[in-house]
Design a protein with these regions (language model features):
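Active-site-proximal beta-alpha core segment in soluble small-molecule metabolic enzymes
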Residues: 5-13, 20-21, 28, 32-205
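Active-site anion/phosphate-binding pocket segments in diverse small-molecule metabolic enzymes
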Residues: 2-20, 24, 28, 70-71, ...
């Protein structure tokens, strides 16, 4: 990583001021005693997990969640000492490393629960875990019938401390709220059974980004914002949207220019055929950097604050755009693929729309060849 983006033809700029702003927006929906567990899985949705977590910690966040063991270990090795919850599936062979790095697992099956119980016996204090209830996502988790009896067993006493109970909402951003309401009803029934046993759970959490805005009754004691931290939402048009600011901009530089005649072709298989003399700018970014090949012949980039359409097939390392109507363009000219340039902007949700996906995939797909440049909050 370098602090001088002019030395890099292609880079992602991460605006930590926007990140802090988005966190403030999220907190406006919460009661004062409701905590935030920041979701920084998938390299913080492509933004860089270590720097993003460190920036959020400076903003007072004390709880983080990742998808996998290796993501949690990376944060520990970077010096993050606060709570790190591993949301994804765990395997028996991973338990020693999990315990060694003081990572908090979300447990979804009885076998891993047994293994954790044995591993935690050598731990000097009760080892915290969260339990996941499957309420309608059809993915990880104990069924309600499986979970409640566990609290009557010795399995959840002694070396383990059940610190949290969670579920994952499948349709919090859907137009119909009935799916979320059914899931919440199932979850609350399990929670009630546990509390009737006199068991206190410090952290109860169900709310993802969309639920934070739409369903205040899902907040409980902890919420799990992900995409909203990074400046995007998937709320229906009928729901007032928060004032979020996209955090990541993707930029590159014109590396070569050429004029092709009418009938000339661009890129593999000659799929673009010029209908007039056409000025082509070559950009040093491609699908190996996470700029999808599905963007071939669709979408645009910004040069001089104007849209230049992508022409031909996106290559592994290069993209070509038509700059005929943006004279004069020069080698070394700044190009914005995601972000704002002048009065015009292209954000990840628009790029996602061009290729039939979601902003999450666009952001997470930006590869390791693209350096991240951090603008301090």
């Amino acid at each position: 990583m370098t602090s001088n983006p002019t030395l890099l033809p292609t880079y992602a700029s991460i605006n930590l001021t926007a990140l802090a702003h988005n966190l403030s927006c999220i907190k406006q929906y919460l009661a004062p005693d409701c905590q935030v567990m920041a979701i920084v899985k998938a390299n913080a949705y492509g933004h860089g997990v270590v720097e993003t977590a460190q920036a959020l910690a400076r903003q007072g966040i004390e709880r983080f969640a990742v998808a996998s063991l290796d993501e949690g270990i990376a944060l520990r090795q970077a010096g993050l000492s606060t709570s790190i919850v591993v949301l994804g599936a765990l395997f028996e062979e991973q338990i020693p490393d999990l315990v060694a790095h003081r990572l908090t697992p979300v447990v979804s099956d009885a076998h891993i629960l047994h293994i954790l119980t044995k591993a935690a016996q050598s731990h000097p204090a009760s080892y915290p875990i969260h339990l996941k209830v499957e309420t309608g996502m059809g993915r990880l988790g104990f069924s309600p019938a499986e979970l409640s009896p566990l609290f009557d067993e010795m399995l959840l006493r002694g070396p383990l401390q059940v610190e949290g109970l969670m579920t994952h909402l499948a349709d919090a951003d859907g137009k119909n709220s009935s799916v979320t309401e059914r899931q919440l009803e199932t979850f609350c029934a399990v929670l009630s059974q546990i509390r009737q046993r006199g068991i206190t759970l410090p952290f109860v959490h169900t709310a993802n980004s969309a639920a934070i805005v739409r369903f205040p009754n899902t907040h409980f004691s902890l919420v799990r914002p992900g995409i909203m931290l990074y400046g995007y939402h998937t709320l229906p048009d009928t729901v007032p949207a928060p004032d979020l600011r996209p955090v990541l901009s993707l930029r590159t530089t014109v590396v070569q220019l050429r004029t092709i005649p009418q009938g000339g072709t661009v890129s593999y298989n000659g799929t673009f055929v010029a209908t007039r003399p056409t000025r082509i700018a070559v950009l040093p970014i491609g699908y190996a950097d996470g700029y999808s090949r599905r963007l071939s012949h669709r979408g645009s980039v910004l040069i001089q604050g104007r849209r230049a359409p992508i022409v031909g097939l996106v290559c592994m390392d290069m993209v070509m755009v038509d700059v005929t109507d943006i004279p004069p363009v020069h080698i070394g000219e700044a190009v914005t693929l995601i972000g704002q340039q002048g009065e015009e902007s292209i954000w990840a949700n628009e790029v996602a729309g061009w290729i039939g996906t979601i902003s999450y995939e666009v952001l997470c797909g930006i590869g390791s060849r693209v350096p991240r440049i951090y603008e301090s909050a």
